[in-house]
Amino acid sequence: MQKYLVNAYLDSYDTITIEMNKDFFAGQTKSFQLVKDDKLVELTIRDFQSLNDKDVYHLDLNVSIDFTSQYSIMTYNAYLTPLIYRFVVKTEQFQNQFYYQENDLGVVVKDGKTTFKLWAPTASNVWLVINDKMYKMNRGNKGVYSICFDIDLTNMSYNYLVNVNGMTNLTIDPYGKCQKPNSTASIVVDTSADNSSVREKKRDLIIYEVSVRDYSKESTFKAMKDGLDYLKNLGINVVQLLPVNDFAGVNDYFPKRYYNWGYTPVSYQSLKQSYNSKIDSYLAINQQFKDLVDEIHKNDMLITLDVVFNHHYNACDSCFEKIVPYYYFRFENGDYSVKGGCGAEFDTKLLMCRKYFIDTLVYFTKYFDIDGFRFDLMGFLDVETMNQIASTLKKIKPNILLYGEGWVMDSAEKEVKLANHDNRELMPDYAFFDDEFRDCFKGNTFDYANKGYLTGNYQLANWAEKFFSNDRHQYINFVQCHDNMTCFDKIQLSCPDESHQRHIARQKLLIAAVLFARGISFISAGQEFCISKGNRENCYNASDEINNLTNYDKSKYQQVIDYTTALIGIKKEIILNDNSVCKNYDGLLLIKNNNYELIFNPKEEKCKYSFHDEKRVIFDGNKKTDYLVNNHFEIDRLSFVILKEEK
C-alpha cells in the first residue's frame, strides 16, 4: 500500500479520513478539496485529532462518489494525493451496490468463445494482458469488467492490469483454474464439465492425513496415484491431503530446494505446480490430480482437501489486494489483522469474499469430484459463511464431509459469530477436532512431561469414559496431526524411564482409542509406524529428510502397522452404536456396546477379567482372533482387547 505525506481515504459514503504526516507543514491545514478532472468540491472538516506522528482529519462528503473514477484530494500549497477507496468497501451500502450473484467470474470457454470477467468495483480501468498485448476490458453491472474473444484460448496465459487507488497493478486471476509455475500468470482452462458423483455414506469414517510431497520420493500427484496400495491395504477410507492449491515457500522449478507443507496460500482455485510431473505442461497438473482422485475412488476411499481460507500468506502482494484493496481482509487499527500468526485474516462475512470461497469449493467438488474439506483454523471464519458452504455443497453431494479446527481464536472480527467450538451447535453439518480427546489420552500437547490416560495417568479414566458413551458425530478423535510433535515423540518425552517396547505398546493403545471412541477417527501419516521427527514441534518447513515418509524404515514397526490394519478391519466389520456403557474399574476401561466389550488396560500389570458366561475373543491385544473363552480372560499389560458376548 502506497503511503504519501498526505493520505486520503474514503471510509464511508459520507466520510473521508485524512492522515497527514507532521513533516508536511507541521501536519496542519485548514482546507481540503475533492478533485476530479477539472471539477473541484470544497470539503468540510468534521473533526481533528493530533497524534504523535500524524494529524488525522475527518471530512464530511456531501456529493455522490462515482466508483468508476479516480479522485484526488487537494490541500495546502496545492498538494494533490489520490483518494483511496478504503473502508468504504466494507460498508453494507457497498455490499448492496456491488454484490455480483452470477457464477461466471474468471474465464468461461464455451461454443468456441472465451470470456474473461473480473470483479473490480473500485478500479477505474482494467486491461487483459495476453502475450504482452493489452486489451481494455468493459465495465459492466456490479463492478464486473469483461471481454470476450471469438476463439477458444485454452492453454493461453494471461494477467490483469488493474488501475485502482492511483496505482496500476499487474496480477493473476483469483478465479484462475491454473497458474504458471510460481504464480506468474494464469492459464485459460475449460472447466465447464461437472465430474461430481454421489457416493454412499461411509458408516465409520477413518481419515488419513498425508502430504502429497511426503508420500513419495517424486512428490507428485502421479507418484501418489501409482503408490496407493499402501493406503488401500491399511484400510482407511478417507484420504485427507494437506494443501494442494497454489502456495508460496516452494519454487515450482526447484521444488526440492525448500520444503513447505502449503499453509502459505497464494492462489486458491489452482493447484501447486511443484506436484506436476510435467512442469512444462501447465495444464497437465489438473489431469494428474483428477487421475489421483479417480484412483482413490476406485480403491473405495474418499478424498478430502485441507483448505486454508482463514489467512493469506502475503496479503499486500496478493491478487485480492491488487484488485480490490482493503476489501478481502480484516483490518485492525488501520493495518491487516494477523491474530493467527500466519498471515492476514480473510473478512469472510463480506459477501464477495464469502462468495469467492463458496465458488472455490463448488469448483473442486464438481470439477475434481472432491468428497469433503478440512478447514484450517476454522475458528477465524464466520458461522454464516460456513453454513452457506454446507448448504451449497450438500446440493451437489448430500454426504459431503466437512470438518475443521474449531479453536477459539482471538480475532479482529467482533460483529458476527465465528466457527469455533463454542458455536458448534450452530453448525450441525461440521465436525470439530477434539483437543480434549487428544489431551485426555495422550497428555497435554504443550506440556511435554504431562501424561494422559494411556501414557501413565490412570486417574484420568473417569474423564476418558465420556469419549466412549456419548453421541460424538461432531467430533474428530485424534492424538496426532501435522501440527506439533508426533505422538511417538510425545510418548518418549512423557515416559522417559520406560523401554522402547513400552513406548510402542502405548502408541498402539492410542491408535485403538482413536479408532474405537465414538466420533470420527483421524490418523496422521506415519502414526501407524511410530514416526519420530526428533521431538520437533513444527515441521512445516523442516526438510524432505525429516518429513518424507519414504525415508522411514516401516519394517521396524511392522507390528504396529499390522495392529492398526487389524483394528481398522474390525471397526468396519462390527456394528457399534451410540449407546455404549463405559465404566472405570480402578484404571481399566470397560466399554459395552451391542454385545461387544472393549477393554483398555493401560497399566503395567496384567488383569484378570472374570465373567459368568462364554465370550468370543475378537482381538487379543495384538491381532485379530476368533476363539471362545469361559469364565475369565487375562488382559495383558498395556493392551486393548475386544470380546463378544455369545448368546
Label each residue range with its predicted role.
Residues 176-182, 390-538, 575, 584-585, ...:
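Conserved alpha/beta catalytic core and glycan-binding cleft of carbohydrate-active enzymes
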Residues 118, 210, 241, 296, ...:
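Conserved, mostly hydrophobic/aromatic
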Residues 2-7, 52-115, 134-209, 216:
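The feature marks proteins involved in alpha-glucan
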Residues 154-156, 626-647:
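C-terminal beta-strand-rich structural cap/linker in extracellular carbohydrate-active enzymes
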Residues 519-537, 542-596, 603:
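Glycan-recognition and catalytic regions of carbohydrate-active enzymes
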Residues 23-43, 124-132:
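Short, surface-exposed alpha-helix to beta-strand junction/turn motifs within ectodomains of secreted
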Residues 110-124, 581-612:
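Carbohydrate-binding surface patches
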Residues 211-222, 226-368, 378-381, 386-397:
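Substrate-binding/active-site clefts of carbohydrate-active enzymes
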